[in-house]
Amino acid sequence: MKSKYSKLLKNRNLKFGLSLFAFFILLVVLSFIAAPYSYQDVFPDFQLAAPFWKSASQSQFLLGTDDLGRDLLSRLLVGARFSVGIGIVSTVFSIMIAASLGIVSGYYKGRVDKTLNQIMESLQAIPSLLLALIVIVVLGSGLLNTVLSVTIVALPSMYRLVRSAALVECSKEYIQASEALGASSLRIMAQHLLPNCLTPILVQSAVCFSDAVLNTAALGFLGLGVQAPYPEWGTMLSDAKNFIEVAPWLMTIPGFCLLLLILSTQLISDGLRDQLDPKLRNRA
């Protein structure tokens, strides 16, 4: 077991991606214990205050303030809760739903497989952001509906990967032997199919997380995601777009955080695929 983990950690992409992701988890923790101010605190005398590298005399707000005089560092830390939190929660939900449906579809085949395929193909035919917008328009904006919308967007890709892996496993002799010995369908799916589908689930989960973060930010930027006063990073970008010429740091700092967070999960996905896919591992 230790040798497996050591081989995984030798992958540069995986190591760098995990390090970056750990940094954002640290930001989430710091938002509870080390945020200088509340994200709602307003300082009217310090509207659009410059960050420390532009104004050496201004040390009260390290990253400056927004147009209302709210501390950007505090809002950035609290915003990490929403961006990272929504990404994790929606990814977990999409794995639970799509993996279950994919295994059921791959095992039972027939009408069940056909029905689920038609549903997922219908969802996948709609561009991801447009699908998220449709869900938001139907259900309304807000935190819970944002989580639901990005979860639904992630379902088709996860479902197809798990279904393909389940179909491959179902064609193997040990599944047929288990059925001949009288093992129940639930036992076969839980004890045999699910463990052998974990590799594509792990790889795709990192991709689902980055897609969830990106879609959440896009919805927030359009004013349809997490609503004020909560400082989700996409919402912060939307609030700052009118001040990009006079206070560009209001957009560049949250935007750079989004870039690094998405980059970290993409690197994790690439590293996991390189190490867990036998074809790529043998080629390397």
State the predicted function of each range:
Residues M1-I95, A99, I103, G110, ...:
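Gly/Trp-centered helix-boundary motif
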Residues F24, I103, A132-V137, T146, ...:
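Transmembrane alpha-helix boundary and packing residues in multipass membrane permease domains
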Residues F24-V28, I136-V137, V150-P156, V207, ...:
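Alpha-helical transmembrane segments of multi-pass membrane proteins
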Residues S31-Y39, G106-G110, V135-S141, V153, ...:
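Short helix-capping/hinge motifs at transmembrane helix termini and TM-loop junctions
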Residues L62, D66, L72, F93-A98, ...:
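Generic hydrophobic transmembrane alpha-helix motif, especially the helices
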Residues I136-V138, V150, A165-A166, L214-C257, ...:
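Glycine-rich helix-loop "coupling/hinge" segments at transmembrane-helix boundaries
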Residues R163-E179, S185:
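Membrane-helix/interface signature in polytopic inner-membrane proteins
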